[in-house]
UniProtKB/Swiss-Prot annotation:
Keywords: 4Fe-4S, Iron, Iron-sulfur, Metal-binding, Oxidoreductase, Repeat, S-adenosyl-L-methionine
Protein name in UniProt: 4-hydroxyphenylacetate decarboxylase activating enzyme
Domain of life: Bacteria
Record gene name: csdA
Top enzyme class: oxidoreductase
Lineage: Bacteria, Bacillati, Bacillota, Clostridia, Eubacteriales
Gene3D superfamilies the record matches: 3.30.70.20, Aldolase class I (3.20.20.70)
Domain 4Fe-4S ferredoxin-type: 47-79, 80-112
Spans traversing the lipid bilayer: none
UniProt GO MF annotations: 4 iron, 4 sulfur cluster binding; metal ion binding; oxidoreductase activity
Subunit structure: Monomer.
Family, per entry: Belongs to the organic radical-activating enzymes family.
């Protein structure tokens, strides 16, 4: 199998990404560009770097990265900050700057794995999972590597490994259904039921996502599906949005949703990528508001979990 997957992180002992203790595999590349994203390094499928300016030693005269870069992509601006020319940086294949940095201020965001290399890691972690754990494929969005992912899923099936996925659901329907037929447990995000607001916050309309969920429910798939919503004040926290989602869930016999309280844990990553994070001063969701939304779902016979307080 020559297909390779582009992965930016693998985390063992994950306990909030599906049933039991799991290994989470983070694929690079996402068809959405959510303005609040906690993993903005996952957006592009191109290899790239991140810069931790707080540990960079340029003030002490270090120029290791500049001297190592063969694309002339790294410079210091007049205000003394490290500046990356991303257009030329993303063409790099060697990442000499990362290897030469003595302070680990530069990080390569992606690594290539073959199917066998990834399976070696999963089999290594197998005994850590217990009877109800397994692997969760997340990202980014793993559907962007569907050919590689299907090969991994087949080998997981042969090895009796429980398989979960976290996905936006934004993919061609044949790709979506082909991958999901191998999945035991799925989280699918529904950011907003209003298609214009969905595009405003994520860069894409929600039509394809909703139609894929409907198609999955009409198929003979027998896995467990939990919808997820990152809940953001002023964007998707209205009763109107909740009732529209409740209507959609009841129509499609969906009975579980996980509301995730908005956080800013990804802000540092935005800075390290040279991107502006417009949600840095955005209002927090109160516990009272989260509980109010939860009650709306409960009143309509839908199990609603807040954050990590889940039965899985």
């Amino acid at each position: 199998m020559k297909e390779k997957g582009l992965i930016f992180d693998i985390q063992s002992f994950s306990v909030h990404d599906g049933p039991g203790c799991r290994t989470s595999v983070f694929f690079i590349g996402c068809p959405l560009q959510c303005k609040w994203c906690a993993n903005p390094e996952s957006w592009t499928k191109k290899k790239h770097i991140m810069v931790a300016e707080n540990v960079c030693k340029w003030k002490n005269g270090c120029r290791s990265c500049i001297n190592a870069c063969s694309h002339d992509s790294i410079k210091f601006s007049e205000d003394g900050k490290l500046k990356i020319s991303w257009d030329t940086c993303e063409k790099c294949e060697t990442f000499d700057c990362v290897n030469m940095c003595p302070n680990n201020a530069l990080k390569q965001c992606v690594k290539e794995y073959t199917v066998d290399e990834l399976m070696t890691i999963l089999k290594r972690d197998f005994n850590n999972w217990g009877s109800d754990g397994g692997v969760t494929f997340t990202g980014g969005d793993p559907l962007m590597h569907h050919e590689f992912l299907v090969e991994v899923l087949k080998k997981c099936y042969d090895s009796q490994i429980h398989k979960a996925i976290e996905t936006s659901g934004y993919a061609k329907q044949e790709v979506f259904l082909e991958v999901l037929k191998y999945i035991d447990f799925a989280f699918i995000d529904v950011k907003n039921m209003d298609r214009e607001k969905h595009k405003q916050g994520t860069g894409v309309y929600n039509d394809l996502i909703l139609s894929n969920i409907e198609a999955l429910k009409k198929s003979n798939w027998n896995g467990r599906l939990v919808l997820r919503q990152p809940t953001i004040a002023g964007y998707n926290d209205s009763d109107e949005n909740a009732y529209k989602l409740i209507e959609f869930m009841n129509k499609n016999s969906l009975y579980e949703i996980n509301l995730l309280k908005f956080h800013r844990l990804g802000e540092t990553k935005w800075n390290q990528l040279g991107k502006e994070y417009e949600y840095s001063k955005y209002g927090d969701m109160t516990n009272e508001k989260m509980e109010h939304l939860q009650q709306l779902y409960l009143d309509n016979n839908i199990a609603c979990y807040i954050g990590d307080n889940t039965p899985f």
